[in-house]
Amino acid sequence: MVNLPFAGHTNPTLGLARVLTDMGHRVTYIHSPAWREAVENTGAHFVPYDDYPLFPRPFQDRMRCWRAAYRTVLRIGAGYDCLLYEMLFVSGKALADRLGIVPIRIFSTFALNEHVLEDFGRNGGLYLTSIFRFPRLRALISAPMSRRYGWRFRELEAEIVRNSPALNITYTPRSFQVYAGEFPQSRYAFVGASIDGCRHEPCELPEGGGPLVYISLGTELNKSERFFRRCVEAFGGTGVRVVMAIGNSV
């Protein structure tokens, strides 16, 4: 297994690593050094990225991790049966093909195709979706990455959509998947949410019997105090129980 150092893309995969090791499989998980404890708690063998700092600066976490993860898999991956990679590691399919092993892609949220990415680029926030909104920007970014990582296609969207592995595991129920009918059951397993339990800290839900709503902005764009205040105002006095993940910056 290989992943990039982002909590929202990593946490859903830890339960899978645990299940595979419990079944007797030898699982090696390549990740940032900061994720050693979380990975080793699953029973998997942890391998840190080659030539990567223990405490990287934010820019390194976002950029250098791609090359470090790729080089580490390339160095040790040939002896394995398959490569499980989270979808953000776009080079996973091309890398598995280069190593001659089976690729398996994991979607930590919903599955992607050209229609999903088109909607994503049109409706999502500019910071994360501009690459899918502006073709020239996408081409400018895609070309050097395609050459460096041996993509089948020169363009990012084509590599994601058209160079798809035979098995894709999606942590979203099919009933929640947008354009669900465009994802064949023979290639996409919609397994639902992966929640590995509260193993490290006590986890107590709000008291009461009302509906439970979980609110999160993820790990990247989560510094909106205004958003969380509006959620409190919206649900206040409704009888709804609310759990908010606000990180350490609000």
Where are these regions (language model features)?
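Ser/Thr-centric signal marking residues that sit
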Residues: N3, T28, T172, S216-T219
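Short, flexible loop segments at the rims of nucleotide/cofactor-binding pockets, characterized by
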Residues: P5, F59-C65, M145-Y149, A193, ...
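A short, aliphatic-rich alpha-helical micro-motif
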Residues: G77, R162, P206-G208
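Donor-nucleotide binding loops and adjacent catalytic segments primarily
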Residues: S175-V250
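Short gly/ser/thr-rich secondary-structure transition/capping motifs
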Residues: R64-A68, E86, R148-F153, D196-R199
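Active-site-proximal region of nucleotide-activated glycan assembly enzymes
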Residues: V102-V178, F183-R187
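Structural motif
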Residues: D81-C82, L167, L212
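Glycosyltransferase specificity loop/lid
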Residues: M1-P135, S142, R226-R230, F235-V250
